[in-house]
Every structure is written in C-alpha cells, then in structure tokens.
Amino acid sequence: MADAFGDELFSVFEDDSTSAAGAKKDKEKEKWKGPPGSADKAGKRLDTKLQSESASGGKNKRDLDVEGTDEPIFGKKPRIEDSINEDLSLADLMPRVKVQSVETVEGCTHEVALPADEDYIPLKPRVGKAAKEYPFILDAFQREAIQCVDNNQSVLVSAHTSAGKTVCAEYAIALALREKQRVIFTSPIKALSNQKYREMYEEFQDVGLMTGDVTINPTASCLVMTTEILRSMLYRGSEVMREVAWVIFDEIHYMRDSERGVVWEETIILLPDNVHYVFLSATIPNARQFAEWICHLHKQPCHVIYTDYRPTPLQHYIFPAGGDGLHLVVDENGDFREDNFNTAMQVLRDAGDLAKGDQKGRKGGTKGPSNVFKIVKMIMERNFQPVIIFSFSKKDCEAYALQMTKLDFNTDEEKKMVEEVFNNAIDCLSDEDKKLPQVEHVLPLLKRGIGIHHGGLLPILKETIEILFSEGLIKALFATETFAMGINMPARTVLFTNARKYDGKDFRWISSGEYIQMSGRAGRRGMDDRGIVILMVDEKMSPTIGKQLLKGSADPLNSAFHLTYNMVLNLLRVEEINPEYMLEKSFYQFQHYRAIPGVVEKVKNSEEQYNKIVIPNEENVVIYYKIRQQLAKLGKEIEEYIHKPKYCLPFLQPGRLVKVKNEGDDFGWGVVVNFSKKSNVKPNSGELDPLYVVEVLLRCSKESLKNSATEAAKPAKPDEKGEMQVVPVLVHLLSAISTVRLYIPKDLRPVDNRQSVLKSIQEVQRRFPDGVPLLDPIDDMGIQDQGLKKVIQKVEAFEHRMYSHPLHNDPNLETVYTLCERKAQIALDIKSAKRELKKARTVLQMDELKCRKRVLRRLGFATSSDVIEMKGRVACEISSADELLLTEMMFNGLFNDLSSEQATALLSCFVFQENSSEMPKLTEQLAGPLRQMQECAKRIAKVSAEAKLEIDEETYLSSFKPHLMDVVYTWATGATFAHICKMTDVFEGSIIRCMRRLEELLRQMCQAAKAIGNTELENKFAEGITKIKRDIVFAASLYL
C-alpha cells in the first residue's frame, strides 16, 4: 500500500464519500465544553454549538485549506539503507583517533589517545637517573605523568587545585634543560606569569620572561610567557620556535573563557607537530575529548592522567542567614546529608523576612553584614584560620573587611613583620604615591591580619598582600573569585558570603564548577587534616539546587572559538596555512564532529522503530490524526483569547472552579481564592499584558510541600490523599474556567477547612458525569472579537469532519490513534536528527568567515583573491584592540592633527573595559576626536551589515568606552596619580590596568606606523608611551 505519511492535510477534504450530507448533527446543543484541545482521546467532548450546514461548506473550505500544516507530518517512508550510506561518507569526516586505557593504581585514571593506525606501545620505565629528584614521595598521578614525559609523550594532567600538578611541569622543564632543548611555559595572565617566573627562576636559573609588559632574558632555555605572546611568535615565524621541544600550558581550562579562550586554541593549532605538550588543568569531565583533539591535530599520542583525589578532604557547611550555627551538608567522604540541608533551610524559613534579600540576591535587613562578622569571629575562636572570604563584587570585599575593624588576629611580633614587608614593598614608590588613600588605608588592616584582594587594588598592594598571605601574616583575606585562579595560595577555610552572583546579565546561583574552583582553596596539604568550606545562604534553595551546587561536577572544557579579524588577516599573510584550515582544525569543530556517530546511531534506531510500527488502514488513520492535530492547534488559539486579562479577570472571583495545567503537571480542578498583578515585570521585558497571578486552592502532593516554596508544588498522585494548598498560578496555566462557583471558608489556614473544599469539588464532578460545564467564550464571556469567531467556525468545520469520519466511533480508535501519534513523533525525531547531521557535517562558522572576508575586501584590507593589502599588513600588527577601526583611523589621517596626549587619550577608549556610572564631561579637544572615531566606527558597522555580518551598530559603538579619556589625558600631561584618582569613580587598580593595556596598544601602534613608513606618527605614539609610563602606574612587579 502507498505510504500515507506523505499526504498534506488538505487531503482530508477530498474524501467526499462521507460528505456534509451525512453530518452527525444529532449532538445536543449544550454548554461550551472547552476548546477542542481539551478533548479526551476519543474526541467525545468536541461538540461545540454546531452551526448550520454551511459551516463545513464552500465558504470555509478555503479557510481550512490555508490552515493546513506547512509540511507533511510524516516524510517519505525512511529506508535504513539511506542512513547507512550516510554513515559511509561520514568515515572521511571523523577524526581518526582511538583511546586505550592504561592500567594504574586506584584514585587515578590513565588513558591515551592514539592515531587510529598506531598500536599502543606501553610506556618504558626510566633508564638511568631522573631529570629531577623530589624530596617527597610522589602521588600516583604525578608518577604516571612523569613517566609519560620520560617517554617523550604529550600528557594532560587534570587534578584539583593544590593537588601538585606543577611537579609534572617542573619535571618536563628539567628534562628539556638536561637534553639541551628549549621549553616554553605559558600561563593565562601576566600576574601568574610573573609568579611562575619567580618559582622557575629559583629552581632552574636559565629562565626568561616575556609578557608584553616585561622581557627578561629572552634567550634563556626556559621561557615563561603569556599565551598571547606565544601566538604572535608563531604568526611571526620566530626563530625560537625551531628549538622548542616542550610547551607547557598552565590552567588549560581557561580555554573556555569566552573572550580570550580562542587564543589558546589558535596557539595549539599553530604549534608544529614535533613539539610535545604538558597541559595542566583543573578537573574537567571531558579531559579525554581534549586529548583526542590533540592527537587528531598533531598526529601524536596524548595521555590523560585524571584524578579526583584531594590530599586534604573537605567538609562543606551551610550557614543560613538569621541562624547562628553551621550545618554540615557534605562530609569529608563526599556524602550529601539531606536532613541537615533541610534543617538549614527550615532555619532560613523561620528567620523569615529578616533574612530575605531583595530580588537581586543582596542581603536584606540588618543581619547581613553581622553574619560575616559572626562567622569570621567563630572561625578564629575555633582556630580554623587562615580563611579566604569570597565575595562577588569589589565593593562587598571592602565593606566586609571594614566591618572587621574591631578584630585583631596578629601578635605584636607579626605586626612588626607586616610593617617591614609592607614598607620594603612600597619603597620603590615616590613619596607622593606612598600617601595615596588606598596605600594608607590598607596598612592598619594588614597589621591586624586582615587583607583585601580584588582587581581594583593597586597591583603593588595586591602582590604585597599575596606575599603576606603566603607567609601566614594574613589570617582573613577578603577576595573576589579572581584569587581562585592559578596562584597556589591555599587556606584552611573558605567562606562564601553569598551563593548568588551577578554575571553581567543577571543574578544567578554560582555554578558547581565555580564552587569547585573556589572551594578548592580550602585545606593545606601536609598542614590540615581537612579543609572547611562554609556557604552563606540568604535565600531559600531547593535540595536539588543545593546538591547540584555542592556535589555537582566541574564545568566541561567547551571551546569558545570565534573568528577575529586579526586571526583572519594573519592567516592570509602566512603562506602555509589559511583561515579555513584554522576553522576545520579547531576544538570547536572537533567537538561537533564527535557528536556525529551518536546522531547517526539515533537516526538508525528511530528509522528501525518507525518501520516496525504497522497501522491497519494507515491512510485513513493519518487523515483522522491530522484533523485532531488541527483541532488541538485551534484549541490553543481559543485558549489564548480566553486568557487575555480583559476577558477572564471578571470571572476569576473567589470560589470559581478552574482547571490548572502546566507543562508536566496536571492539577485538575481547583478553586480560585484571589488574583493579583505580578509586580516585578520589567517595563521593557517584551511582555505586553502585565502578568496576573491567580491564587488557586489545589490538591498537591505532601512531599512537594515539605521543603520548598508553594511555587514548586506538584499535583497529588491518583492513589494519594494529598493536601489542599493555595498555589500561585499564572493566568495562562488555567486550561479551563467553569460556570460553577463554590462557597469557600473565610479562613483557609486550618487544614480541615481546606480539605472541605476538596469534598465540594468532588461533589461537582459527580453531578456532571459528562464533564463540568465551562464558560462559553462568546455567550458567557462576551468576547466579540472577529478573530475568535473565525477560529470557532474553523473548529466547527473540523469537528464536523471528525464526527463524520468512519474512525470516530471505531472501537479500536484508541489503539490505532496512539500508534499513529507515536509514529508521527518518530518522524519528527528523524527529521531533526537529520538536520543535526547536516549541521555537524558543515564546517561551522564558514559563512561568518565569508562575511568577514567580504568586509576586508570592501575596506581594502585584502583583494578578491585573498591576497593581503598594505592596510591588512598594518592591521596584523594590532592584536590588543579593534584592528579594523584603528587601521581605518590611521589611513584616514585621524591621528595626524592630534597631539601625543590627545592620541593617547583617544586610544584609551579601546582598552578600558569596565563599567563606570560617571560619563566624563569632555572638552572639545577630546570630544572632537571621539566623534570622528565614532563616525569611522559607524562606517565599519555599515559595511559589516552590508556584508551580511550580524552586527548591532549601537552595541558596537558602546564597546568603545570614553570613561577614562580625560583621566588618561591629564595623566599624560604630567598630573599626579592622586589627582587623577579624584577625577573618576573607577578603582585605582582598574585605572592602572587600563594604562598598562594602553602602553601595550601604543607599542603595537608604533609597529603599525612603522609598517607604513610614517615616522611622524610612530614618534607620536612612542612619545605617548614615555608620557604615561611613569611612577606607580608602571611600578615593577615584586615577583621580578
């Protein structure tokens, strides 16, 4: 028989054998029985008022045809062979990698990713002396990793913070130095590079540093550098690379950073195949996938050594706001104690409104701050210091630290030492800089053993505080989460002042990955028998969220690869490699390729299931199925009319019977108690009608009412007595409104009063065996909208078709209908899986690459045959800001008439990235150039939009922030740091960070000017560097 699933819906109207003549109109006229979507399976209650015969006659036929579904519900009958053929062509796409497990001791897993055509050769034990001896016994994972390095094979070491990953890196350095090879150690941030340089230098001496800010001994055998520097060395074909045998990537999990992660990916792709790697990472669940990518990319084995082992086990406590004690929720064996968790949440509930923060998750009442004080005091009394207190904003950090002024944790002897270290550190500052408020305010705190660490601090103070903390002279350190990155400074206790953070878009619970990274600072190896983590919670949290947060897994390493113009231009400039290659080889693309076999499997299984389902008289059943689907769709449209507040609110009086149904839960009938407008709807949130919340008395499962808010209530199971509870429900979740109203008791607090309402509801249902009567949208609710009338006409016509269909009264209807539904769902699954396949097979971002090349051609950076032009060569020199806009400005002569101070101030817009509430009032000498720059940016946005690149002009323009223009200008004219700090509300540390980035950009601008031979411009930028590079802004790092 032909396959019915290719039929369009209109075929419904072509079987005239059971035409309107045989219409069953003996259905009695009765009250509105609800929108057609609410029909039971056999369509028993779809009998709305049937109008005259013409409802299904000529006038409506065209209407109904138009309503037909856009595509066949079922495609052609799928054939298994098709997907097998697809499979064959996939073989070429799939990365040729296999993974072998290696036997190892407990508490550590060892796998190796190999090219598919290579056999695994077990690692050979070391012959002769080790490249480096250690004074302590190595852990299993360290021994395994060192064996890989001894065998000259790449390895990814994934372990918790402070588990001792650095040992593996040091060994690779020692081996390279012994073999007279060069080795590069890269780290994500300059501050971390400085610290690593210090450590490595003390260990090996033959060590250099390159961070962009500072270059020390660049001919050394071991070079510590930021990933950005390594990337530019690779693009420039630096000689150094020829001698490199090992590259060590520290904190490789940084690769998921949305802004800078792409630099790691570029660098790893550009590195030659003969180099070996050591990757150090926090715990990542998909470490094996990363190793497979490295193997696929560089045609060499890559080992994964993974351990969850913590040398010091952790205990996790919750401190509920308003309570006065700690609750152990995860013990040192990693077991989640649900009863303790629920007790803590109960304390929070009892503390009531006092502990309630406002909607944004900030502290409320007066208890907030004193809680931190209470806990810190308790930590000191129990001798659990040193403690790191994590807050999610710089302001909170400082506010909490200042509350500690009454406490003193240091002895007189320690105070003297703090003062000595502090004075030595700031010795390099000028007398004037020593008097800066930040410098003067922090010393009294430090002497009492209290420190602050966030991005707004002067770098020199930040480093002083790190040194004091590592020497045990700071007992309580108030820090933002940046302190959890990289630098190995463990404490005994970690305290979170909040479980929610603002991530630039909204307030949310912190992720389990963030929690793992920060809480990993607790517990010092060899000093503490266990680490303590305390989480302050001031908002109710369900056990699910709690468990997910405290016991969840680390965040996977997902690629954040995206194209940049600098990347595209550099790849066009380099002979051997093109941008398409970079896209194909990216981890981003690899992760999508890895999904292919799973999708193919899914298609295969679905098609087998599809072919197994045999429906007798299939064509007929499908016609009937489509009619019912269409009725359900129209039913939804009617519901939308009924839900409009102007129509339904007058009927939601107390006592009205309503049916409540949300996505997964059907509560059945309940009784309206009250309704109110939802207050916190944002005016621009795109919600046209204000949201109304109806309080409905519903039968809920007792379990769901136990430990969470009533919003999370679930319906009682059929066999459960349940409990009547008032639940807030949004209007659109009311699936039906009845004509019936019941009397409800005035006081609904006593359980008996609420349960009495349930008896009344059951009585109503007994009285109306055919279903509780519903409000008719036209007759009862008085909706006069023409649109609704049209929908009802269509419903009547479709119902007519349904009642007159031979299947409608068939005793087997239920069975065949369920089969048909199942088959339709499988057909949809197959369709979406095939779409997924198609997507996975195309190289991602290829369209964007085409658009970007189009922009480069139109702006004259490259020719139509992808040959780079002069403009493009200039743009290649600029990597730390918007290379397109800066090159355009240069070629348009925008900098020619500016003084070096003006040019420097204008460039600050490109490197300042923070938010400042104050917009400076700029003088014309700064506002003029800013306007010209914005005009130039508008032109680029316009060209980009014409080249079909998704770009929002306003967002693009607002990414250049002029907030520090006047500050930089004043600094460049010779003002003191104290003076410029008073000009803005931006933190001192942020000003310095902006200046240092600015100096880096000025150096790149010098190179760019040199590339076009414009000496005057080159000198102007060089003069800018001289003017800003002075005093505290460029005070050398204490680690160097």
Curated annotation (Swiss-Prot):
One Gene Ontology term, aspect cellular component: nuclear exosome (RNase complex)
Keywords in UniProt for this one?
A: Acetylation, ATP-binding, DNA damage, Helicase, Hydrolase, Isopeptide bond, mRNA processing, mRNA splicing, Nucleotide-binding, Nucleus, Phosphoprotein, rRNA processing, Spliceosome, Ubl conjugation
User: Transmembrane segments in this chain: where?
Assistant: none
| N6-acetyllysine found at | 49, 76
**Domain of life of the organism encoding this protein:** Eukaryota
Top EC class per UniProt? hydrolase
Q: Where does ATP bind?
A: 137, 159-166
Record field: catalytic activity: ATP + H2O = ADP + phosphate + H(+)
SMART domains per the UniProt record, alphabetical: DEXDc (SM00487), DSHCT (SM01142), HELICc (SM00490)
Q: Name one GO molecular function term.
A: RNA binding
InterPro entries documented for this protein = DEAD/DEAH_box_helicase_dom (IPR011545), Helicase_ATP-bd (IPR014001), Helicase_C-like (IPR001650), MTR4-like_stalk (IPR048392), MTR4_beta-barrel (IPR025696), P-loop_NTPase (IPR027417), RNA-DNA_Helicase (IPR050699), SKI2-like (IPR016438)
Q: Where is this motif: DEIH box?
A: 250-253
What are the Phosphoserine sites (modified residues) in this protein? Answer: 38
Q: Where in the cell is it found?
A: Nucleus, Nucleoplasm; Nucleus, Nucleolus; Nucleus; Nucleus speckle
List, for all copies, the residue spans of the domain called Helicase C-terminal: 403-575
Q: Which residues form a coiled coil?
A: none
Domain annotation Helicase ATP-binding: ranges = 146-302
Report where the covalent cross-link Glycyl lysine isopeptide (Lys-Gly) (interchain with G-Cter in SUMO2) sits. 24, 356, 682, 721
Compositionally biased spans, kind Basic and acidic residues: 23-33, 41-50
Q: What does the entry give for GO biological process?
A: DNA damage response; maturation of 5.8S rRNA; mRNA processing; RNA catabolic process; RNA splicing; rRNA processing
Which PANTHER family does this entry report, sorted A to Z?
Answer: ATP-DEPENDENT RNA AND DNA HELICASE, EXOSOME RNA HELICASE MTR4
Summary of subunit composition and partner proteins: Component of a TRAMP-like complex, an ATP-dependent exosome regulatory complex consisting of a helicase (MTREX), an oligadenylate polymerase (TENT4B or TENT4A), and a substrate specific RNA-binding factor (ZCCHC7 or ZCCHC8). Several TRAMP-like complexes exist with specific compositions and are associated with nuclear, or nucleolar RNA exosomes. Identified in the spliceosome C complex. Component of the poly(A) tail exosome targeting (PAXT) complex made of PABPN1, ZFC3H1 and MTREX that directs a subset of long and polyadenylated poly(A) RNAs for exosomal degradation.
Q: Which family does it belong to?
A: Belongs to the helicase family. SKI2 subfamily.
Its name, as the record gives it, is Exosome RNA helicase MTR4
Q: Source gene?
A: Mtrex
